Amino acid sequence: MKLALIAGTDAAIALALRLLEAEPGAVIVSTRPHADPRIRPISSIKAFLAESFATFDAFAFIGALGICVRSLAPHLADKRTDPAVVNLDEAGRHVQSVLSGHLGGANALARRLAHALGAEPVITTASDVQELWSLDLLARTHGWTPAASPDLNAVIARFVNRRPTALLLEVRDRGTA
């Protein structure tokens, strides 16, 4: 997973450097001047996202959630294609899954980063909170290729609201005729 750690304050940079131990392939970017060669200087978060949004699989914003959301808004398209996004407070107490929790992997990333910091992961997707299957990950889990379905969100809503839900699977696994 190609991960960008976006740090806007000195405390955020310090936290990003700690995260490099758990995520050695991550790239730290910051608008703050810094002598550490591991930190890539950027002119602004807005400009960085405009040029790099499609080149990263995941973004971890360290700082205010509002900055994270406002910075991302112009680039968002669809939960099936948007990258994973998490947000951390600069003290490293909480790691919140913000965008593409299941399909993009933000929930898993939030848990992984929280574990590395001894922080609390904040996961708000209904299936995770209720400890239910993630229907949108079911096909990936089993190596299936799902057909595009505009109704998937409606099915997920029925499922997490404990309504009768049927999944029709046309699957040919190894060993089946």
Residue ranges and their predicted role:
Residues 5-14, 62-70, 79, 91-94, ...:
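Gly/Ser/Thr-rich loops at beta-strand to alpha-helix junctions
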Residues 1-2, 24, 55-58, 80-84, ...:
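Short coil/turn connectors at secondary-structure junctions
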Residues 101-177:
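Internal alpha/beta core interface subdomains
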Residues 18-24, 74-80, 103, 138-139, ...:
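Short, solvent-exposed amphipathic alpha-helical segments in soluble enzyme
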Residues 49-53, 58-87:
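Hydrophobic/aromatic-rich, well-ordered segments within soluble, folded domains that form packed cores
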Residues 28-51:
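N-terminal beta-loop-helix "entrance" segment that forms/cooperates
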Residues 1-33:
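N-terminal basic/disordered segments at the start of proteins
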Residues 27-31, 60-63, 87-88, 121-125, ...:
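General beta-strand structural signal in soluble alpha/beta enzymes
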